[in-house]
Design a protein with these regions (language model features):
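Glycine-rich flexible loops
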Residues: 1-114
């Protein structure tokens, strides 16, 4: 299945450690489009790129969905830019895991004010 690879650390930190799946094209609102989306996503995956449409993001809150959408945009742009110097390089799995663990550690601390 095509995808945007995990070549930006933030993808791993925001629930996309294997990258962003790409759903095949289907006309907007048609059963084919819905079937392609369902076939492309897995539990816990908060985004999918819809071929010939754009990104579809879903998360616990609208704020997190917007954040993940920005991360997907950053990864797509990084992939395009990297194409001019040989192509993007995926982050090794152990480093993706470390990035996610670090993000979870930060989140568990909550917001602190000075």
């Amino acid at each position: 299945m095509p995808r945007i690879g995990c070549w930006v650390e933030a993808l791993a930190m925001f629930g996309l450690p294997t990258g962003v799946p790409v759903a095949g094209y289907g006309p907007r609102g048609f059963a084919e489009a819905v079937a392609n989306i369902r076939a492309s996503i897995a539990p816990g995956v908060p985004a999918v790129l819809l071929a010939n449409h754009g990104v579809l993001v879903f998360h616990r809150t609208p704020e997190l969905a917007i954040l993940v959408g920005g991360v997907v945009e950053e990864a797509a742009q990084a992939g395009l830019n990297a194409g001019s110097i040989g192509g993007p390089v995926e982050i090794p799995e152990e480093l993706r895991v470390a990035a996610l663990q670090r993000a979870m550690a930060f989140e568990s601390q909550g917001t602190r004010h000075a």
